[in-house]
């Protein structure tokens, strides 16, 4: 019952406020992981210049909000920041002073709620004892650590910058100074047995981290992993292995008190990610830095994924982004995807209220085969994947998308 109350109150508290999130993309990494297709550079030459440009964009985006408030007479001027998230890339390549400088810039230009969640993504090789102590005295109150695996062979195959010993050592240290810690683990890795995957999870549990994000290894175009597979040097990931690992993950974590609140995310009570949940619950967010995305409820924008072009635009006092106005179908499809992936599901009354009866009828019709196959279920007017359907959620969602609709 306690978990049930927390799940509903968590969503209500986020949805009931008019604020949003700020995401800051730090586009630098020490080396390129083989599977990664996010935007980053392994050259640190422009790091200091980038930090200053990001600070300037924070001011420019606030000015944009103020302009919107004046022209549209909406509440943009009073928009409060509830979470700040440093992602990348590898944000832990910044010095603590640089991180604190950017946080101070957020506070300077925006209204920030009391005790906001402030997350730093970090790699184990950056988290020495000295750095962890330093961060624990900073404004950062949540760490998201890219462990990925506790096995040397997996880390080598992924071309991670840390080794297995560093993965364990950083958690041993981090848990002494931070309560709110999330780690990333990757499953479906070629050659990884069910027993090894179980051991990865058990190792994470031993350190007592309260949040785990876990993703299947995917092969993206233009990555080193894709090239290695095409050359036959690495075996391609198998769906059946990923599904077996997913089931082990869900069963093990739920047995150990974790709530499976989003397809790839598991949290103990009081440790759900407020930042990511803001995205999933349809709240507004501002993305700062190269390749960062923003959403205001009506439109989506994205910054140029090129460090040099980003810096040039900011120097010329131009926001380096493109924008699209979302159609009703776009917003419906997004809600279907995020809703099905979360524990809160898709509320049928919200579909009718926000999108109309045509969309509701379409959703009910498209869902019928999945309900019949026990992959989806409707309870209390909420559409959700069943345990049997969870692993297939993304594919199911795409079949429920509204297409060929003339606005």
Label each region the model flagged:
Residues 371-381:
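A short, conserved structural fragment
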Residues 357-371:
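Short amphipathic alpha-helical interaction segments
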Residues 15-17:
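Glycine-biased, low-complexity coil/linker segments
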Residues 388-407:
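Short, amphipathic alpha-helical interaction segments positioned at domain boundaries
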Residues 382-386:
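Minor-groove-contacting beta-hairpin "wing" of winged helix-turn-helix DNA-binding domains
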Residues 25-38:
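Local cysteine-cluster metal-coordination motifs and their immediate loop/turn environment
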Residues 6, 19-21, 40-64, 68, ...:
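C-terminal scaffold of the Radical SAM
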């Amino acid at each position: 019952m306690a978990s049930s109350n927390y799940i509903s109150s968590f969503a209500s508290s986020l949805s009931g406020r008019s604020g949003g999130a700020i995401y800051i993309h730090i586009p630098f990494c020490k080396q390129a992981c083989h599977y990664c297709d996010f935007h980053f550079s392994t050259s640190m030459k422009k790091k200091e210049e980038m930090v200053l440009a990001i600070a300037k964009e924070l001011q420019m985006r606030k000015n944009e909000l103020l302009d919107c408030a004046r022209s549209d007479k909406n509440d943009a001027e009073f928009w409060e920041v509830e979470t700040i998230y440093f992602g990348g890339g590898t944000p832990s390549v910044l010095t603590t002073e640089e991180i604190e400088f950017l946080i101070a810039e957020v506070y300077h230009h925006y209204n920030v709620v009391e005790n906001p969640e402030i997350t730093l993504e970090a790699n184990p090789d950056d988290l020495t004892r000295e750095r962890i102590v330093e961060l624990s005295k900073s404004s950062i109150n949540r760490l998201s650590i890219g462990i990925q695996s506790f096995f040397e062979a997996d880390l080598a195959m992924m071309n991670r910058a840390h080794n297995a010993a560093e993965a364990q050592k950083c958690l041993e240290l981090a848990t002494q100074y931070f309560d709110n810690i999330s780690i990333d683990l990757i499953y479906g890795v070629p050659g990884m047995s069910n027993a090894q995957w179980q051991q990865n999870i058990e190792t994470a549990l031993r350190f007592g981290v309260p949040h785990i994000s876990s993703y299947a290894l995917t092969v993206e175009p233009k990555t080193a992993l894709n090239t290695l597979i095409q050359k036959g040097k690495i075996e391609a990931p198998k769906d059946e292995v990923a599904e077996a690992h997913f089931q082990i993950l869900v069963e093990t974590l739920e047995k150990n008190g974790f709530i499976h609140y989003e397809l790839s995310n598991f949290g103990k009570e009081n440790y759900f990610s407020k930042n990511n949940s803001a995205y999933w619950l349809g709240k507004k967010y501002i993305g700062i830095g190269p390749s960062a995305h923003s959403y205001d409820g009506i439109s989506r924008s994205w910054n140029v994924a090129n460090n040099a072009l980003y810096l040039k635009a900011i120097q010329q006092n131009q926001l380096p982004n493109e924008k699209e106005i979302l159609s009703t179908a776009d917003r419906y499809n997004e809600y279907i995807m995020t809703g099905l992936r979360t524990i809160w599901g898709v509320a049928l009354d919200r579909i009718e209220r926000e999108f109309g009866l045509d969309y509701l009828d379409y959703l009910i019709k498209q869902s019928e085969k999945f309900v019949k196959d026990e992959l989806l279920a409707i309870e209390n007017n909420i559409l959700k994947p069943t345990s049997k359907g969870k692993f297939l959620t993304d594919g199911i969602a795409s079949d429920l998308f509204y297409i060929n609709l003339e606005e």
